[in-house]
């Protein structure tokens, strides 16, 4: 039985619906694929199902090592129950290997290992193209407090350490990834926790032996076999054995 719920927000890859209890939301994973700030668009059947499973798997394990996040439980193929947070308007990117915009900006060769893991901040605004910003911008415009920045950086590096090992164990190199954070309030105090998703949509993942791309760059660069590559990531993690049978289910 399908129940209609109030839509709270719709982004490029997900929809947030009102949750069953106060302080909760339902996060629905769409099949929409976008790149270059939504200038390139397509529907990739089954992408939402795979990303839901991969993000569930990773968020559950991060919770287990003390990286608190918004994930509560998966509800069905496309949806998960999450904690409602006040999203910090920043994308936090951790880079291990030169790829994407950092290679272009700094004239680096794609695939070149960076001297150390580098954290970058981007202001979340599609109309502006998600510009890169500094800690000075973040505190000056009150997007986040200094302590929140420190907490986000510490969590991002912890996620990087864990995911680098997790993926290395299944023959995948974690090149870089993007995470988002949100505030949860407890009385007069708030703290930041990990939010959004972690999936091949938000990570650059290369096969360790061949450097074959297993992530959203396959869509960005018209390399083809996007769903097959996402499924391969899920298969190596032991989540799925084969491409999912797509069922357009869910609460909406």
Curated annotation (Swiss-Prot):
Keywords from the UniProt entry: ATP-binding, Ligase, Nucleotide-binding, Purine biosynthesis
Any single GO BP term: 'de novo' IMP biosynthetic process
Recorded GO CC terms: cytosol
Pfam families, sorted: SAICAR_synt
Reactions that this protein is recorded to catalyse: 5-amino-1-(5-phospho-D-ribosyl)imidazole-4-carboxylate + L-aspartate + ATP = (2S)-2-[5-amino-1-(5-phospho-beta-D-ribosyl)imidazole-4-carboxamido]succinate + ADP + phosphate + 2 H(+)
Pathway where this protein functions: Purine metabolism; IMP biosynthesis via de novo pathway; 5-amino-1-(5-phospho-D-ribosyl)imidazole-4-carboxamide from 5-amino-1-(5-phospho-D-ribosyl)imidazole-4-carboxylate: step 1/2
Enzyme Commission no: 6.3.2.6
GO MF term (any one): phosphoribosylaminoimidazolesuccinocarboxamide synthase activity
Superkingdom of origin: Bacteria
PROSITE patterns, A to Z: SAICAR_SYNTHETASE_1
Sequence similarity: Belongs to the SAICAR synthetase family.
NCBIfam families named in the record: purC
Protein's name according to its UniProt entry: Phosphoribosylaminoimidazole-succinocarboxamide synthase 1
Gene designation: purC1
């Amino acid at each position: 039985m399908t129940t209609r719920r109030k839509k709270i927000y719709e982004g490029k890859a997900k929809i947030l619906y009102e949750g069953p209890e106060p302080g909760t939301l339902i996060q629905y994973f769409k099949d929409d694929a976008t790149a270059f700030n939504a200038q390139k668009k397509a529907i990739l059947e089954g992408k939402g199902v795979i990303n839901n499973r991969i993000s569930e798997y990773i968020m559950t394990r991060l919770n287990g090592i003390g990286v608190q996040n918004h994930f509560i439980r998966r509800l069905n193929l496309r949806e998960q129950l999450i904690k409602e947070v006040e999203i910090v308007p920043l994308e936090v990117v951790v880079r291990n290997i030169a790829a994407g915009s950092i290679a272009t900006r700094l004239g680096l060769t794609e695939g070149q290992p960076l001297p150390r893991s580098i954290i970058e901040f981007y202001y979340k605004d599609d109309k502006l193209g998600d510009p890169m910003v500094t800690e000075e911008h973040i505190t000056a415009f009150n997007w986040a407090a200094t302590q929140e920045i420190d907490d986000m950086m510490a969590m991002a590096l912890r996620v990087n350490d864990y995911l680098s090992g997790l993926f290395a164990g299944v023959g995948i190199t974690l090149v870089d990834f993007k995470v988002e954070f949100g505030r949860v309030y407890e009385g007069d105090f708030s703290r930041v926790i990990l939010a959004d998703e972690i999936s091949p949509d938000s990570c650059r993942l290369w096969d360790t032996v061949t450097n074959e791309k297993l992530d959203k760059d396959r869509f960005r660069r018209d390399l083809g076999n996007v769903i097959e590559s996402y499924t391969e990531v899920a298969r190596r993690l032991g989540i799925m054995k084969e491409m999912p049978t797509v069922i357009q289910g869910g609460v909406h």
